């Protein structure tokens, strides 16, 4: 059975439910305006462990979604519904892959067909043009397209946005989109940042070029989420376990944003961050923030319940090039967590 036919039926079902809820008060049908986007790379046991999960683990993720009443839709449909101000179904998910590895076609695709789940693949076109070992071919990508899979832009040569000028990045993105269009026909303007790295200037470039941007920082997506850097939960390597994946797939979008500093780029190993937390079905007194799993100090401007802004601080530690601060709060009435993460990038460190 083709992915596109099932996806269309899910889409029609969602629109029908939205209509019914417009006529009735569907308080329980929609809990929060929220969707979780996951990102995978390899589905294999013979590829780098940090970006891989086994076929058995991937099947377990899909079975969890199927058996626990999740709705899986294409990212384009979710973004469109958010931008229209429409209602989103409870427990909504989009599945994505980065890079265009061969195991996506040979292993992940049949499993996703089995469950009838739509998905998106972000490809770097250079390795595919060179027929580089381990990557899909254009012929395989055409078969995915024919099954309703969305093919997104991951640049031409998978270069970090922090390692090239804006003119170079613009040319790289446009070239990749041209190759995708030439081989597969028009595709939505979706761009996943290589390595998940971006600057304020590169986010502005993505908006200028008319793309929706996808990051690799954890968290769910809601109406106020920055669409030049939508969060995605990486679910591979040490994060491939079903217990952790189940928790993350169940999270809710936190209406939160970093107010200071103004950029995620830093040369500090322990930058402080001032975060604005919007209203939601949670107690601000129960917000907890973490740095690599360690609790952070939270200093509210006033009392927690009387303020919407807090500064979070951490201790000095050795860092790599990328890390995240994570803030969560339990939902008042559901066994789910609001989840926000703030990524940091130190481009002086090696990739």
Describe the function of each predicted region.
Residues 76, 216-217:
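Beta->alpha turn/N-cap motifs
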Residues 212-216, 226:
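Soluble mature domains adjacent to a membrane tether on cell-surface and organelle-surface proteins
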Residues 2-91, 110-119, 125-136, 235-351:
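Terminal accessory/targeting
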Residues 195, 217-218:
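Short secondary-structure boundary segments
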Residues 115, 209-210:
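Short, structured coil segments at secondary-structure junctions
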Residues 33-52, 68-71, 81-93, 101-204, ...:
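Metal-dependent polysaccharide deacetylase catalytic core of the NodB/CE4 family, i.e.
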Residues 70, 211-212:
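Conserved acetyl-CoA-binding loop of GNAT-fold acetyltransferases
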């Amino acid at each position: 059975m083709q992915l596109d036919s099932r996806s269309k039926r899910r889409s029609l079902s969602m629109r029908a439910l939205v209509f019914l809820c417009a006529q009735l008060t569907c308080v329980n049908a929609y809990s929060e305006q929220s969707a979780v986007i996951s990102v995978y790379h390899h589905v294999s046991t013979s590829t780098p462990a940090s970006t891989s999960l086994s076929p058995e683990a991937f099947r377990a993720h899909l079975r969890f979604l199927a058996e626990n009443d999740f709705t899986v839709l294409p990212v384009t449909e979710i973004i469109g519904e958010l931008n229209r101000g429409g209602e989103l179904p409870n427990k909504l998910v989009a599945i994505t892959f980065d890079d265009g590895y061969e195991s996506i076609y040979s292993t992940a695709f049949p499993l996703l067909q089995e469950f009838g789940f739509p998905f998106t693949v972000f490809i770097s076109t250079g390795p595919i043009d060179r027929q580089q070992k381990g990557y899909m071919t254009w012929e395989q990508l055409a078969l995915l397209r024919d099954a309703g899979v969305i093919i997104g832009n991951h640049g031409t040569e998978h270069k970090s946005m922090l390692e090239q000028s804006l003119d170079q990045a613009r040319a790289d993105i446009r070239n990749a989109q041209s190759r995708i269009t030439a081989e597969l026909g028009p595709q939505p303007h979706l761009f996943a940042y290589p390595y998940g790295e971006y600057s304020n200037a590169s986010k502005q470039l993505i908006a200028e070029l008319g793309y929706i941007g996808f990051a690799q920082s954890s968290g769910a997506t809601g109406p106020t989420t920055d669409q030049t850097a939508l969060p995605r939960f990486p679910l591979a390597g040490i994060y491939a376990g079903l217990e952790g994946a189940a928790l993350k797939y169940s999270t809710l979008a936190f209406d939160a944003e970093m107010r200071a500093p103004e950029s995620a780029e830093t040369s500090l190993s322990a930058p402080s961050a001032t975060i604005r937390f919007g209203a939601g079905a949670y107690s601000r007194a129960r917000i907890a923030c973490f740095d690599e799993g360690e609790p952070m100090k939270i200093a509210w401007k006033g009392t927690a319940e009387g303020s919407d802004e807090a500064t979070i601080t951490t201790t000095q530690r050795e860092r790599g090039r990328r890390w995240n601060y994570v803030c969560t709060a339990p939902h008042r009435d559901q066994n789910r967590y609001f989840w926000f993460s703030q990524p940091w990038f130190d481009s002086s460190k090696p990739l």
